[in-house]
Structures are given as C-alpha cells and as structure tokens.
Amino acid sequence: MEVTVTRLYALIYDYVDDDVLERRAPHRELHIRMVRERLADGRLIMAGALGDDPPHGGLLVFADAGEAEEFAEADPYVTSGLVRAWRVDPWQTVS
C-alpha cells in the first residue's frame, strides 16, 4: 500500500475569553474577507472556529508556513487583541 504524506501548516488561535463573539463583531467582516481571498487563490486550504458557542479558538490550514504567519500578523482578530496566543504548527497528513 502506497502512502502519500503532505506537509501543511496549522495556524491555531486561542481566543481571549467568553465574550469573544461580541468583541469580534466589528472585526469579523475584514477577517472573513481575508479568509475568502486566501481560499479563492489557494493560499488557505480550510478555516474555522474551534469549540462550541462561544468558540475558544480558530484553526486555519495553509500550504506554506510563511503565509500562515503573514495572515496572523495582519488579521484584525490578532491586531485587535481577540487572540490571546497564536502559533503555526507543521501538520503532516497521510492519505
């Protein structure tokens, strides 16, 4: 059986606290626009919230670590202080 290993990069956000839904509202439109632009051009593979309401974080999967870091540094969720911590972790998928 042949196995294909693909290296991707997970950008993981830890949100600040339980009122994140209210606090993110003014920044959500730009955040979603940034996500959609990168999904459309292939730089971003998938993205979504982690946890139930309210979410406790986010997960964005990129093909390039540099793209993940650049996204986080420009993301209004990060620059406005909604994200307590973020990191980019290598993720090896097997298919």
Locations of regions flagged by a protein language model:
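Conserved, structured core segments of small domains
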Residues: 1-95
